[in-house]
C-alpha cells in the first residue's frame, strides 16, 4: 500500500517537494505511523504545527462538534466562533485587533498591506521595508520579496521593490539601511528556516528604538517560533518589547489551516478599512473553533510551564551529542525550537534517522531542526538523542 500511495501522489501532484519515501497514515501523541503500522517519533511537528501532538481527544471532539454545526459562512455575516477566537488571541498577544487568514504566508501579506496602508493614512510617503538576511517569511510574492535567501527570490524576479536586507543581530547594519522611505522593519524573533538563529534582547530592543525614533513600524513574524514554542506565548514577549504588527499561524490551530496578523491600537485605527483587505475562508467557524480550543488546552495543561521544564533537558541532551560526536558542532535556539549544527550533509543524517524511526528536518545548510510537538516528555527526548547519535556516527 505504501508504494501505491506514493505513486498516486507522484502521478497527480505537482512536484514541488522532495519527499522522503514514507507515507504517514495516523498519529498519537508525539508519534506517527505508516499504513503498515511502523512507528515514527516526530521531532518536526509538521513544521512546528502540531504542538498538541496527534489525536488529542479534547481537540478532536471540539472540531467534530463544530463540523456538525457549520464549517463555513461568508464574512458578510457574524458567526459564533470568530469573535471568541479573536478575543482569545488578543488576550495572549496583548494586541488590539486581529485579522484571521488561512496561513502564515497570508498573514505576512496582510502585515505588508497594513504597514503600507498605515504610511498612506499618515501621508508619510513611506513604502520600503527592511528585512533580514537568512530570513524566511513564506512563498507568496510579497513574502518572497521579504525573504533573505536569494535562491527563493531569483526565479520570480522582479519581486516587490523597496526591500533592503540587514544582517541579523547587527544593529549597525539595520541603521545603515534606514531612510525616509522606510515604512517597516520585519524580522523573525527566532529564525527557523535560516538556521535556528535567535535574536538577542539587545537587538530586539535596538530595533524597537530605531522604529520609535524614525516613525517606522516593527513587525515580528512569529509564524514558526510563536504559540508557546519559545517558552512564552510568543517569543517577542521575552524580549522586553512590543511590535506594532505581528504574524502567527502554524500551531495556533493545531493542524487546522489558520493564521492571523494582529496590531496595536495606533496601527489598527490608521490602516485597513472595509474594502482594503479580505478573505473568503479566514475567520471561518471551524478554524476559529480550533484556535480557541488550542488556547484552552494550552492553559488547562500548563503548556508553557511544560515547555520551560522540558526545553533545558533537550538542550542538555543535544549538548551531550556535541560533546561526544565529532560531527556535532553547536546547540542553537531556545525553548522547543532548537537546532544542532553539524558537519555532515543534512540529507544523509535525516535519511538515516528516518530509517531508525525519527522524523527530523534541516534548517539552513548545516543545522538539524528540533521542533517537536510541545507535549513531548523526557523519554521522547532520550529516544531522539539515541537515534540521532546513530545517524551522526
Task: Describe the residue ranges of each PLM region.
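Conserved N-terminal phosphate-binding loop of PLP-dependent enzymes in the Aspartate aminotransferase
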Residues: 1-393
Amino acid at each position: 500500500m505504501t508504494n501505491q500511495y506514493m505513486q498516486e501522489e507522484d502521478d497527480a501532484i505537482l512536484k514541488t517537494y522532495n519527499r522522503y519515501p514514507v507515507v504517514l497514515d495516523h498519529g498519537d501523541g508525539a508519534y506517527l505511523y505508516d499504513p503498515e503500522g511502523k512507528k515514527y517519533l516526530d521531532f518536526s511537528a509538521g513544521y512546528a504545527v502540531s504542538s498538541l501532538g496527534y489525536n488529542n481527544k479534547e481537540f478532536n471532539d471540539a472540531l467534530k462538534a463544530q463540523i456538525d454545526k457549520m464549517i463555513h459562512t461568508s464574512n458578510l455575516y457574524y458567526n459564533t466562533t470568530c469573535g471568541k477566537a479573536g478575543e482569545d488571541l488578543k488576550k495572549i498577544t496583548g494586541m488590539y485587533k486581529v485579522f484571521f487568514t488561512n496561513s502564515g504566508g497570508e498573514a505576512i501579506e496582510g502585515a505588508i498591506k497594513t504597514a503600507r496602508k498605515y504610511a498612506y493614512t499618515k501621508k508619510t510617503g513611506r513604502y520600503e521595508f527592511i528585512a533580514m538576511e537568512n530570513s524566511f517569511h513564506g512563498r507568496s510574492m510579497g513574502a518572497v520579496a521579504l525573504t533573505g535567501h536569494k535562491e527563493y527570490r531569483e526565479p520570480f524576479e522582479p519581486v516587490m521593490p523597496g526591500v533592503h536586507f540587514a544582517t541579523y543581530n547587527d544593529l549597525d547594519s539595520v541603521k545603515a539601511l534606514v531612510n525616509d522611505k522606510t515604512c517597516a522593519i520585519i524580522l523573525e524573533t527566532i529564525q527557523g528556516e535560516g538556521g535556528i538563529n535567535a535574536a538577542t534582547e539587545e537587538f530586539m530592543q535596538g530595533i524597537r528604538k530605531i522604529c520609535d525614533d524614525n516613525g517606522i513600524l516593527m513587525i515580528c513574524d512569529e509564524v514558526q517560533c510563536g504559540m508557546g514554542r519559545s517558552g512564552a506565548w510568543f517569543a517577542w514577549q521575552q524580549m522586553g518589547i512590543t511590535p506594532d504588527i505581528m504574524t502567527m499561524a502554524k500551531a495556533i490551530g493545531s493542524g487546522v489551516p489558520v493564521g492571523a496578523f494582529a496590531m496595536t491600537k495606533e496601527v489598527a485605527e490608521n490602516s485597513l478599512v472595509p474594502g482594503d483587505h479580505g478573505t473568503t475562508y479566514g475567520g471561518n467557524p471551524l478554524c476559529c473553533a480550533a484556535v480557541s480550543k488550542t488556547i484552552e488546552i494550552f492553559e488547562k495543561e500548563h503548556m508553557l510551564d511544560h515547555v520551560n521544564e522540558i526545553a533545558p533537558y533537550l538542550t542538555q541532551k543535544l549538548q551531550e551529542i556535541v560533546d561526544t560526536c565529532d560531527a556535532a558542532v553547536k546547540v542553537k535556539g531556545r525553548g522547543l525550537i532548537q537546532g544542532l549544527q553539524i558537519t555532515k550533509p543534512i540529507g544523509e543524517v535525516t535519511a538515516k534517522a528516518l530509517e531508525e524511526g525519527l522524523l527530523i528536518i534541516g534548517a539552513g545548510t548545516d543545522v538539524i531542526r528540533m521542533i517537536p510537538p510541545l507535549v513531548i516528555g523526557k523519554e521522547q527526548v532520550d529516544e531522539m538523542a539515541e537515534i540521532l547519535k546513530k545517524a551522526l556516527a
